[in-house]
């Protein structure tokens, strides 16, 4: 063991260390994680220490694996297994800032860098969607925010990484919105057979990831598809119900999904693959999807959910509807952590398509009502160790400061932003989000 430890130390001494004020790995107690911590850890191992303070990786032992963990922390490649991600889908942020949207914090001070602000209040991860050829999207879809091509995502992703956030990449595998109601094949793939489609998914995913890495926008987590409760790349990848709709099959869908996952594994072996489904008013989505995913060996690390109370709950089940699904997934896919990849609740007006119009009796459509929803949601989620992520969808949407007639970003307001469109104020719900930990 002494020889193994010596080799590790010699290798590390040849590197430029990167100190940080992180507690995890700072076994020497000097406020940094560097070579002195490796030396301290080695000395503790050689002395036969069983002090839990030096059990850096939390496996109940003090041994050479803890030295490796300290080294990985210094190199920046260690992923804390207990890390929880808190953030938002901010796919519109760069466009809003380019157009001159004005943001203000709760003190009234102008925020000129929203990514730095998010980091300051305690958020640590941001998601951006990627379309194949968004130029092919309809005028309506473009007015809803469909424009994120690879060049845009590369720029946004680099900003996210440079700001110190984890970067979640959301592949839509479509030229426009992909969700439980539509998973339209990109125009460039419209005539492909299932076999060639899978090959195309693999090649496109691999090329996109390589381009992002080259741009300094390396994703930490990758969604292979968006809200794929009923499959992807329809009709051949449609699996509702059980593959009977439009002659889609689980075999096709799993081939498409696993082709994307394979590209992620090859290009970014340290990245986590997220399988993102949506509750779709289904009282037990995991039973349908989880069983199929297991039977067809979908290759993923994390189960992602979308949860919008306006569409998935009633006034009496705003919090419990999601909690019920979390409990079900703990049984159906016990080995998979869960992340809430999308959620949202209005701060002023009822969202179109609201399932229960009495829902505002529980959480009024006000800044305080929205904030209380976030607080109650976070309180519930914090009770479940299996829940490792929480993301607000379109948190950055803000037309304040723009000329609506000539310079707007969206044609319609998203009612559940975490910014008030009328004055640019960042709402209390944004601050509440940071309490998920």
Residue ranges and their predicted role:
Residues 117-272, 278:
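Substrate-binding cleft and catalytic face of glycoside hydrolase catalytic domains
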Residues 27-50, 59-79:
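Alpha-helical segments with a strong preference for the paired helices of cellulosomal dockerin domains
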Residues 328, 348-437:
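Aromatic-rich peripheral "rim/lid" segments of glycoside hydrolase catalytic domains that contact
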Residues 85-90, 126-128, 167-171, 220-224, ...:
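Hydrophobic faces of well-ordered beta-strands that scaffold small-molecule active sites
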């Amino acid at each position: 063991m002494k020889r193994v430890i010596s080799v590790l130390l010699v290798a590390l001494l040849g590197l430029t260390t990167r100190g940080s004020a992180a507690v995890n790995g700072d076994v020497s107690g000097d406020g940094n994680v560097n070579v002195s911590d490796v030396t301290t850890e080695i000395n503790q191992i050689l002395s036969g220490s069983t002090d839990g303070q030096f059990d850096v990786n939390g496996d109940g032992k003090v041994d050479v694996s803890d030295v490796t963990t300290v080294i990985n922390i210094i190199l920046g490649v260690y992923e804390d297994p207990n890390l929880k991600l808190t953030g938002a889908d901010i796919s519109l942020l760069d466009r809003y800032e380019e157009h001159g949207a004005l943001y203000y914090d709760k003190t009234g001070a102008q925020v000129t860098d929203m990514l730095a602000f998010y980091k300051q209040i305690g958020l640590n991860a941001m998601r951006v969607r990627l379309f194949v050829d968004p130029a092919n999207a309809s005028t309506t879809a473009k007015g809803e925010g469909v424009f994120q091509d690879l060049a845009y995502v590369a720029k946004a992703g680099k900003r996210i990484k440079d700001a110190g956030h984890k970067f979640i990449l959301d592949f839509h595998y479509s030229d426009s919105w992909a969700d439980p109601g539509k998973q339209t094949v990109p125009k460039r793939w419209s005539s492909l057979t299932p076999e060639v489609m899978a090959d195309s998914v693999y090649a496109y995913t691999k090329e996109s990831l390589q381009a992002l890495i080259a741009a300094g926008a390396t994703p930490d987590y990758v969604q292979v598809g968006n809200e794929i409760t009923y499959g992807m790349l329809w009709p051949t990848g449609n699996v509702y119900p059980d593959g009977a709709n439009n002659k889609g099959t689980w075999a096709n869908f799993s081939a498409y999904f696993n082709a994307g996952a394979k590209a992620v594994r090859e290009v970014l072996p340290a990245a986590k693959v997220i399988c993102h489904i949506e509750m779709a008013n289904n009282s037990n989505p995991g039973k349908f999807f989880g069983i199929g995913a297991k039977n067809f060996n979908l290759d993923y690390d994390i189960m992602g959910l979308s949860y919008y109370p306006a569409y998935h709950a009633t006034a009496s089940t705003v919090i419990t509807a999601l909690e019920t699904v979390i409990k079900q997934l703990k049984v159906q896919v016990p080995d998979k952590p869960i992340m809430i990849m999308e959620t949202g609740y209005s701060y002023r007006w009822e969202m179109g398509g609201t399932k229960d119009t009495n829902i505002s009796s529980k959480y009024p459509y006000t800044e305080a009502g929205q904030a209380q929803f976030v607080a109650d949601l976070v309180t519930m989620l914090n009770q479940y160790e299996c829940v490792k992520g929480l993301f607000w969808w379109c948190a950055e949407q803000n037309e304040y400061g723009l000329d609506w007639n000539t310079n707007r970003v969206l044609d319609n307001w998203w009612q559940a932003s975490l910014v008030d469109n009328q004055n640019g104020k960042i709402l209390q719900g944004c601050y509440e989000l940071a309490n998920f930990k």
